[in-house]
Amino acid sequence: MKVAGVFLLLSLALLCFFSGEFSQGGQDKRGWITRSEGRFPGKGVLRHRLFQINCGEFRDPKVFCTRESDPLCGSDGQTYGNKCAFCKALEKSSGKINLKHRGKC
């Protein structure tokens, strides 16, 4: 009986975790997750973590982007060479673009 109870509690905890009940930030009626790093499509914590980009280190205008290749596809259809390039474009657009997916568009 105790094993069944533990299994039930674990199942409920996982259900809540993946359903987005514990996600940080808000979610609008179109399903976009909004945080200080930007907006991301989808629901739930797992989807959010896949599309999470922290642009804090690139907000300083004195920071220049390197040429390392780690492409990101923006919601504007543009492929950005790396996280820094995406974050600079995000800042320039005043948050109007979002991360669509990792990799080339």
UniProtKB/Swiss-Prot annotation:
In-chain residues carrying the UniProt-annotated modification Pyrrolidone carboxylic acid: 24
Location(s) in or outside the cell: Secreted
SS bonds (residue pairs): 55-87, 65-84, 73-105
GO molecular function, one term: serine-type endopeptidase inhibitor activity
GO cellular component labels: extracellular region
Residues making up the signal peptide according to the UniProt record: 1-23
Chief site of localization: secreted
UniProt domain Kazal-like: residue ranges: 49-105
Cited Pfam families: Kazal_1 (PF00050)
Marked site: Reactive bond: 67-68
Secreted in keyword set: yes
Keywords for this protein: Disulfide bond, Protease inhibitor, Pyrrolidone carboxylic acid, Secreted, Serine protease inhibitor, Signal
Entry keyword annotation includes Transport: no
Domain of life: Eukaryota
SUPFAM superfamilies, A to Z: Kazal-type serine protease inhibitors
Function: Serine protease inhibitor selective for kallikreins. Efficiently inhibits KLK4, KLK5, KLK6, KLK7, KLK12, KLK13 and KLK14. Doesn't inhibit KLK8.
Protein name as it appears in the record: Serine protease inhibitor Kazal-type 6
Annotated source species: Rattus norvegicus (Rat)
Organism classification: Eukaryota, Metazoa, Chordata, Craniata, Vertebrata
Gene: Spink6
